[in-house]
Regions:
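Core catalytic lobe of class I
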Residues: 1-315, 320-322
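Conserved SAM-binding loop
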Residues: 325-326
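Positively charged, low-complexity nucleic-acid-binding target-recognition regions
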Residues: 330-340
Length: 340
């Protein structure tokens, strides 16, 4: 699969394999807002039919741990959300507040509207076959605990033979044992803990040297299982959906400059600010991920994905947009972040 290319092709005719996209950034026509492409639909219902087709195709290619960003107009995005909710699980919605946007009404139809200087976006994740939200972790949780289970059960039996956790805490004055054998959160007794337990065995007439040897053997098995667990944990971190951390402290309303000093270089009616686009990409994907752009437009998403070390594949039916996006991405070099 060739990456970092803009195809002169309708997105619905793409040849991408299923579940290949780690991040999809869809900035589709808004319907009769701006640009010739916004006025090509017979009516609003015809437009919504296209939204449904785009949504289905995005659902097909979105990875199981992937994220979808869907841009829209403040009047129309609610209708798109109803459709998108059928195919994805909604994570959040956001508002780009244009801090240098227009401050007055520009048409008669806005006479009874508040001045709008925002654009909206929805953020989705994949939905399971049964419709509920299922992360990578949920169906695989048992794999993380399975290796430890014999040790955990052995430890529970040992504690029970000493009178139970309550008696152990009472006699050792150590609350460490209170959650020591839960399924998802526990750790093996360290040498100090074992020395606390041995007198309890002695009080019951048990050979403490034999028990010390048993604990040492079990500890070695625990360390062996822990190595395997850490390996699985690293694999899980690589596969799970990226957490939307505090890299840029983004909130649901994002005040942001339109960056006209940068975007004016590209003759296209609908352009997003490069810096905001880059911050969303970094927040919702990892380096090396594949970003799919169904509507390339001026190429903002393509260029910024490349700048931060992601691969991209983009589509547009406008030959002029394809050339613009291709040239724009080609001019960008990956700019790795300096370690701090």
């Amino acid at each position: 699969m060739e990456t970092n290319v803009v195809y002169h092709l309708d997105f619905l005719r793409n040849k991408l394999p299923d579940h290949c996209a780690n991040l999809i950034i869809a900035d589709p026509p808004y319907f009769e807002v701006k640009g010739d492409f916004d006025f090509t639909f017979d009516d609003f219902q015809h437009y919504l039919q296209h939204v449904e087709a785009w949504a289905k195709e995005c659902a097909r290619i979105l990875a199981e741990n992937g994220t979808l960003i869907w841009w829209g107009d403040y009047r129309r995005i609610a209708y798109a959300q109803i459709i998108l909710d059928k195919y994805f699980n909604l994570l959040t919605n956001g508002v780009w507040l244009k801090i240098n946007g227009r401050t007055r009404k520009c048409s008669f139809r806005e006479a009874r509207c508040l001045v709008n200087n925002t654009e909206r976006f929805l953020v989705y994740e994949t939905k399971s076959k049964h419709g509920e939200n299922r992360s990578f972790y949920s169906p695989n949780a048992g794999n993380f605990f399975e290796g430890y289970e014999p040790l955990r059960q052995w430890l529970r039996a040992e504690y029970k033979s000493l009178g139970g956790v309550g008696q152990i805490i009472k006699r050792t004055k150590n609350n460490f044992y209170s959650h020591h054998t839960s399924r998802s959160q526990w750790s093996f007794p360290n040498p100090k803990n074992v020395e606390e337990l041995l007198p309890l065995y002695a009080a019951k007439g048990v050979d403490i040297e034999k028990k010390r040897a048993e604990y040492e053997s079990a500890r070695k098995e625990y360390e062996k299982q822990r190595v395997e667990y850490e390996k699985q944990r690293a694999e899980y971190r690589a596969k799970r959906r990226p957490h939307f951390g505090e890299l840029y402290k983004l909130r649901s309303v994002i005040p942001f400059d339109q960056e006209s000093h940068l975007t004016r270089a590209y003759d296209f009616p609908t352009k997003k600010p490069p810096t905001l686009t880059r911050q969303l990409i970094e927040t919702m994907s990892r380096e090396g991920d594949l970003v799919v752009v169904p509507f390339a437009g001026s190429g903002t998403e393509c260029a910024e994905a490349k700048r931060v070390g992601r691969n991209f594949i983009a589509y547009d039916i406008d030959a002029r947009a394809v050339k613009m996006a291709t040239d724009r991405a080609a001019a960008v070099q990956h700019e790795p972040k300096l370690a701090i």
